[in-house]
Amino acid sequence: EFGADLGQQVAFLGESGRALAAAVRHPGRVRWRDTLAIAEEAGVNALPIVTLVAFILGVIIAYQSAVAMRQFGAEVYVADLIGISMVRELAPLMTAILLAGRSGAAFAAEIGTMRVNEEVDALTTFGFDPVRFLVLPRVLAALAVTPLLAVYADVVSILGGALILLTFQVPLVTYFNEVFTLVQMNDLLGGLFKCLVFGLVIA
């Protein structure tokens, strides 16, 4: 049974990869209206929870770090910690967890219901590819919204850290100058690459 399930998973991954490659070669055949609708549900409607979690994360990191760094008069370096940790690691990971829990579960439930109601079999009977009609729009939507949500989480968490450091007498100009000086484009690109991988795995 385990071998059969594993074989089905491998076959599904192969079909999904084939559909994704076909979408790159022939973008006009992609169901963009469905993709945009799914992206709105998975991305735009997730903004409130992403905002809340990212802001709280930035506040907690800033406060805990600033309390320790104040002993050495180095509160300003908390900006470096927030910038690097959020852009490289925490924002992509947090976004992926939220997307998996919220949108990934919705994807599975929706397609599972269609499977039970034999809608997937009906598509196959009428000569339509279920992977192209059902799976591909969700994969493309996840690939699109995961990096965007991560960048948004970066901004929100950095703003949350800025508010905390204001209470430690660190000026906003100094804070943002420290963040933008230390965080490089390679850090952002590395985080975005992780987002693409997470989005693909979740979808």
Residue ranges and their predicted role:
Residues 2-12, 41-55, 91:
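Hydrophobic alpha-helical transmembrane segments
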Residues 2-36:
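Short, membrane-interfacial amphipathic segments enriched in basic
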Residues 32, 63-88, 155-192:
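Membrane-interfacial helix-loop-helix connectors in multipass membrane proteins
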Residues 33, 43, 70-77, 108-120:
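Membrane-helix/interface signature in polytopic inner-membrane proteins
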Residues 41, 45, 49, 74-107, ...:
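Loop-to-helix entry region at the N-terminal start of transmembrane alpha-helices
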Residues 53-60, 100, 137-165, 201-202:
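Hydrophobic alpha-helical transmembrane segments that constitute the membrane-spanning cores
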Residues 63-67, 97, 101, 105-109, ...:
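Short helix-terminus and kink motifs of transmembrane alpha helices
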Residues 110-136:
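Short cytoplasmic-facing helical segments at TM-TM junctions of multi-pass membrane proteins
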